[in-house]
Amino acid sequence: MRKLIAAIAIVTVVHVSSARAQDAAAPFDADLQRLAEILGSLHYLRGICGANEGQKWRNEMQALADAETPSGERRTRLIASFNRGYNGFQQTYRTCTPAANVAIKRYLGEGTKISRDLTARYAN
């Protein structure tokens, strides 16, 4: 989990330093939207599974949005992705189940992979 957070931090720093138009679609937008969806999912699932992390995953999403500084439609899509992840699991799980724990593990792994891939691809 710490690796995921560190990777997210690296990705956000890389994106802040890249020069591009605010509303132009970046080549990594699909990956950022998926990462936002994962963060939303983790925000809900870790809460019902007793992780006692408070707003940790929401704060990670906020840090991603702040670092990326999307505006207009890009910002709307990023936030919608986070909300889709949260709401999707909220409709499915009311309590922590073995399946919820499996989903958490998978999303932590996928989020770490996306963060690493983005860092490797765009850190130059």
Task: Identify the meaning behind each predicted range.
Residues 6-15:
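Bacterial N-terminal signal peptides
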Residues 24, 53-124:
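Compact alpha-helical subdomains of small soluble proteins
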Residues 1-4:
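Positively charged n-region of N-terminal signal peptides that target proteins for export
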Residues 17-21:
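Sec/Tat signal peptide C-region and signal peptidase I cleavage site
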